[in-house]
Amino acid sequence: MAWQRPDGRLPYELRPISFYPSFTRFAPGSVLARCGDTQVLCTVSVNKGVPKFLEGTGKGWLTAEYRMLPSATQKRQERELLKLSGRTQEIQRLIGRSLRAAVDFEALGERTLTVDADVLQADAGTRTTAITGSFVALAHAISKLLQEGVLERSPLCGQVAAVSVGLLEAEPFLDLNYIEDVAATVDFNVVMDQHLGIIEVQGTAEEGSFSRTQLDQLLDVAQKGIQELLIAQREAIADWESLFVIN
């Protein structure tokens, strides 16, 4: 029997996605990203200076941190204080790698952009929502730096969005919620740029294996969702046309 989605969505349908820019006061870029019941607060801060391996090169850097509010899930989780879990470290590296694909670091100069993605509520897809929302926050931060004259030209040279896909009852589904994520026999996180080029694919089978045909189906479904997310991102960035130097 075919999988029936708990929220009534079609197999290739995204959850409702929305961005609330300028959500906090002090960070140059801040966005509350909502994907269904998943909510992630994404902020971008800017500091002079770069890691030692970049000093004197004239190039900037972008790094990311990811955390979950203890009450983001149904059962309260302990705060990660002295040591980060392997999952947290993996996710924040993924966010950083993904967003670095959209930045011209020579245009940024010797400055460091720090992305903070804090999950307020989790219903699966937190890392993909963090990437998609953090890109919007990054664009707003760059816009502010340009307006203030800190930067002479925009270092944004690309656009990045991410989505989850999975196999349920051997069929591909887009943007899994928690119930679906638990039930999926295969689940993927896919990150793409504005040309639908692949930045990263994370995919595993929870039991057994999956075929090359199913892999292609999952990537096709992910591409469809990312096309919609790219449009939603642009609609949340008022000065899109002047801000981006897209190759």
Swiss-Prot record:
Alphabetical GO biological process terms: rRNA catabolic process; rRNA processing; tRNA processing
Enzymatic class: transferase
Annotated EC: 2.7.7.56
Binding site for phosphate: 87, 125-127
Matches recorded under PROSITE patterns: RIBONUCLEASE_PH (PS01277)
Known catalytic reactions: tRNA(n+1) + phosphate = tRNA(n) + a ribonucleoside 5'-diphosphate
Pfam families in alphabetical order: RNase_PH (PF01138), RNase_PH_C (PF03725)
GO MF annotations, alphabetized: 3'-5'-RNA exonuclease activity; tRNA binding; tRNA nucleotidyltransferase activity
Keyword Lyase: no
Keywords noted in UniProt: Nucleotidyltransferase, RNA-binding, rRNA processing, Transferase, tRNA processing, tRNA-binding
Gene3D superfamilies attached to this UniProt entry: GHMP Kinase, N-terminal domain
Coiled-coil ranges (or none): none
InterPro entries xref list: ExoRNase_PH_dom1, ExoRNase_PH_dom2, ExoRNase_PH_dom2_sf, PNPase/RNase_PH_dom_sf, Ribosomal_Su5_D2-typ_SF, RNase_PH, RNase_PH_bac-type, RNase_PH_CS
Family in the record: Belongs to the RNase PH family.
The protein's role, per its UniProt record: Phosphorolytic 3'-5' exoribonuclease that plays an important role in tRNA 3'-end maturation. Removes nucleotide residues following the 3'-CCA terminus of tRNAs; can also add nucleotides to the ends of RNA molecules by using nucleoside diphosphates as substrates, but this may not be physiologically important. Probably plays a role in initiation of 16S rRNA degradation (leading to ribosome degradation) during starvation.
Subunit structure: Homohexameric ring arranged as a trimer of dimers.
Name listed for the protein in its UniProt record: Ribonuclease PH
Organism name: Nostoc punctiforme (strain ATCC 29133 / PCC 73102)
